[in-house]
């Protein structure tokens, strides 16, 4: 499990911002 910023999701070994 990866640590992403609040409001971000982890997918395919990267974090991306969800809106």
Curated annotation (Swiss-Prot):
SS bond partners: 4-15
Predominant location: secreted
Query: Which superkingdom, per the lineage?
Result: Eukaryota
GO cellular component, alphabetical, reads: extracellular region
Q: Where are the transmembrane segments?
A: none
Keywords, ordered alphabetically: Disulfide bond, Lectin, Secreted
Expressed, tissue-wise, as follows:
Expressed by the venom gland.
As for family, the record states: Belongs to the true venom lectin family.
Give the protein's recorded name: C-type lectin domain-containing protein 2
Instruction: Name the species this protein comes from.
Output: Daboia russelii (Russel's viper)
């Amino acid at each position: 499990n990866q640590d992403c910023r609040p409001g971000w999701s982890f997918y395919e070994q990267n974090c991306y911002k969800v809106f």
